[in-house]
Amino acid sequence: MEVRLADCAGFCFGVKRAVDTVYEQLKNGKTIYTYGPIVHNEEVVRELAEKGVRVLESKEELKNLKAGETIPTVIIRAHGVAKEIYDIMEANGLECIDATCPFVKKIHRIVEQKSTEGYHVIVVGDPKHPEVEGLSLIHISEPTRPY
């Protein structure tokens, strides 16, 4: 049997949707920001940067972005973010376009529901990974930590 590896496999549904969202917003001629890289693909992030998309890497950068004559557009990455990020955007009058993968959003809703029902939610994963950060900081009613 011969096993052949593809040079590239393409994007999953959620990543494709997030990237397509950024390209659609670029058509409007506005300055576009993403909170964190839109996806884990340096080639895509670099291509978007060449088209003018700016990546906000921290809460501090986001806090410094304010609505003025124009309202900045910030697109949430495919992996989701913590509730605090949405709150900062709202407080600063920013346009928020949520490109979080629907499957990730579903996990957020389940974790939030179970946490609210009194279940102890254990998140296993890299605490610095965007999906784990989003789950740990957005949807759990009591303080917890990823394992």
Could you say what each language-model-derived stretch is?
Residues A91-Y119, V123, P127:
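Ser/Thr/Gly-rich flexible loops in soluble cytosolic domains mediating phosphotransfer, phosphorylation
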Residues A49-K63:
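Glycine-rich, highly charged phosphate/nucleotide-binding loops
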Residues V39-V44, A82-E84, H129-E133:
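Short, charged/polar "capping" segments at the starts of alpha-helices
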Residues M1-K16, Y23:
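Positively charged, low-complexity intrinsically disordered leader regions
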Residues I138-Y147:
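Single conserved hydrophobic/aromatic residue that forms the stacking wall/gate
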Residues T31-I38, V123-G125:
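Short internal beta-strands
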